[in-house]
Amino acid sequence: MTIKSRIRSIPDYPKKGIMFRDITTLIKDPVGFRLVIDNLTQHYLQNGVDFDVIVGIEARGFIIGGALSYALGKGFVPVRKPGKLPADVASQKYELEYGSDTIEIHIDALEEGSRVLLVDDLLATGGTALAAAALVEKVGGVVAEMAFIVNLPDVGGEQRILDKGYSIFSLTDFEGD
């Protein structure tokens, strides 16, 4: 079975007209979770993307980013929702379909010039990933690449990210599905 075949699709969630891609069915399966981490590890060992640290976006980016950090021998830095980090933070507000949200990172999380692999579970509109990239840059980091389990190219996030000059890698796409 493939990574894609282990992802549950839920129609009309969280609202009518949305096809939700649920990775919990993928990561609860030990073979599926291993496929994710092994494929990402292999990609980053073989493809010469130079980075120093992995930054994971709350919450599922922690699951993937933490395991990948361990597999690659890299440090892990969390990007969190407001009020969850105990020391001084940098914040980044970003727009959602209906409203806005904010994410934070410790101001001392990265060394100046650190090359970062930004990790999250799914790329849809790209808003959260671009906000996280802005945060990384605010605290002195450089985004080397963004990695996702799932890319939804039809939603437009991939193009938004590429238009900003960032590189992305995803394990599977749900295009036109």
Curated annotation (Swiss-Prot):
It comes from the Bacteria. PROSITE patterns: PUR_PYR_PR_TRANSFER. Its EC number is 2.4.2.7. It is found in: Cytoplasm. Pathway: Purine metabolism; AMP biosynthesis via salvage pathway; AMP from adenine: step 1/1. CDD domains: PRTases_typeI. InterPro entries: Ade_phspho_trans, PRibTrfase_dom, PRTase-like, UPRTase/APRTase. Pfam families: Pribosyltran (PF00156). One of its GO terms (cellular component) is cytoplasm. One of its GO terms (biological process) is adenine salvage. It catalyses: AMP + diphosphate = 5-phospho-alpha-D-ribose 1-diphosphate + adenine. The keyword Glycosyltransferase applies. The keyword Glycosyltransferase applies. Keywords: Cytoplasm, Glycosyltransferase, Purine salvage, Transferase. GO terms for molecular function: adenine binding; adenine phosphoribosyltransferase activity; AMP binding. Its main location: cytoplasm. PANTHER family: ADENINE PHOSPHORIBOSYLTRANSFERASE (PTHR32315:SF3). Catalyzes a salvage reaction resulting in the formation of AMP, that is energically less costly than de novo synthesis. Homodimer. Belongs to the purine/pyrimidine phosphoribosyltransferase family. This is Adenine phosphoribosyltransferase. It comes from Chlorobium phaeobacteroides (strain DSM 266 / SMG 266 / 2430).
